[in-house]
Design a protein with these regions (language model features):
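Active-site beta-strand/loop architecture of penicillin-binding DD-peptidases
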Residues: 138
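A short acidic, glycine-rich active-site loop
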Residues: 96-98, 142-149
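Catalytic cores of secreted or luminal carbohydrate-active enzymes
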Residues: 146-171
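Conserved alpha/beta catalytic core and glycan-binding cleft of carbohydrate-active enzymes
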Residues: 1-134, 163-205
Length: 205
């Protein structure tokens, strides 16, 4: 970083090593960001459940907030989630095609609102059906289908909403930038929380 100011150094860690993004001078490894692989695992486990079973597994969704501020996290959808028989993001969701697409839209909505930088995987934004194959290109022909075009539009609009609303990305490593309003106690199918920016402005989600 001394040679290239502003460069990002992103770590991936599975062994539970702490202080990945703490400066070296303070005993850390000095990465600017770290993949939050625990978040990805919890989200895939939760959203892959049929809707009628999610209420009984809400802890997978809610617990992710308890560790969201341990590092400067990136919420990753990496290629590792979509190869070797793990299926595409769309195919991880239960139900018929329309239900799968609704699930993906819901997932991306939660992801955009949750603390942490975002990293999606190519094709997920329009509902790629096949898992990733480096021998072939993305299934662009799917965009001839209205449902896939609508998903692409939805994700594009979510990106615009994210960029326009400072509470969704400012000061997000600070625990004070997030608090639960209702973590599913009133209705286990609905969670509500607040995001707060550096000026104290709130966005209710």
């Amino acid at each position: 970083q001394a040679e290239v100011p502003g460069a990002l150094m992103i770590g991936e860690e599975f062994a539970g090593f702490e202080n990945m993004t703490l400066p070296v001078l303070h005993g850390g490894l000095g990465f600017t960001h770290m993949w939050n692989v625990r978040w990805t695992e919890a989200m895939m486990n939760y959203f892959s459940l049929a809707p009628e079973y999610r209420a009984y597994n809400l802890d997978r969704l809610v617990f992710s907030a308890t560790t969201a501020f341990e590092e400067d996290y990136i919420l990753p959808l990496s290629y590792k989630e979509f190869v070797y028989g793990k299926r595409s993001l769309l195919e991880k969701f239960p139900g018929l095609e329309a239900e799968k697409m609704a699930g993906v839209r819901s997932f991306f909505g939660f992801m955009m609102a949750f603390p942490g930088k975002k990293m999606s995987f190519m094709g997920s934004e329009f509902g790629q059906v096949s898992q990733w194959d480096y021998h072939s290109q993305l299934e662009w022909d799917l965009l001839e289908n209205e449902g896939h075009r609508q998903m692409q539009t939805c994700i594009r609009e979510l990106n615009h909403i994210y960029a326009r609303n400072c509470p969704l990305w400012q000061d997000e490593s600070n625990k004070g930038s997030f608090y639960w309003i209702d973590p599913g106690r009133t209705d286990p199918d609905v969670v509500a929380f607040s995001r707060i920016d550096e000026e104290g402005d709130e966005l209710l989600v």
